[in-house]
């Protein structure tokens, strides 16, 4: 494994450890960012279940997006996951950035999820 990937894995583990301590029973809003798409899930770690999920590959979004790898796609995914989480009865979450820097697509997704009604 390269040093860059090892550093990402270390950051990811560090962020998850801190979240586990601060969660207080709240579900986790987990982000995965690939080079071409962005994915997000609302996970209940106590039950080990995914409560809501959205990605730039969803049929609702894919036709309206130019690409799944830009800020506009991240904003659309953030709004969609907030809508689905509220439908599942979730309003308070902890944000798991998965070791990614809170900038660009990750920040755009988080801001859109907040605007959509998620509290973190």
From Swiss-Prot:
What's the protein name?
Large ribosomal subunit protein uL18
Asked if the keyword Zinc belongs to this entry, the reply reads: no
Keyword set includes Ribosomal protein? yes
- Briefly, what is this protein's role? This is one of the proteins that bind and probably mediate the attachment of the 5S RNA into the large ribosomal subunit, where it forms part of the central protuberance.
What InterPro entries does this protein's entry cite?
Answer: Ribosomal_uL18_bac-type, Ribosomal_uL18_bac/euk
Which molecular function term from Gene Ontology is one that the record holds? Answer: 5S rRNA binding
Q: Where is the signal peptide?
A: none
Which family does the record claim for this protein?
Answer: Belongs to the universal ribosomal protein uL18 family.
What does the subunit section of this Swiss-Prot or TrEMBL entry state? Part of the 50S ribosomal subunit; part of the 5S rRNA/L5/L18/L25 subcomplex. Contacts the 5S and 23S rRNAs.
GO BP, sorted A to Z: translation
| Record gene name | rplR
- Keywords per UniProt: Ribonucleoprotein, Ribosomal protein, RNA-binding, rRNA-binding
Q: Which GO terms describe its cellular component?
A: cytosolic large ribosomal subunit
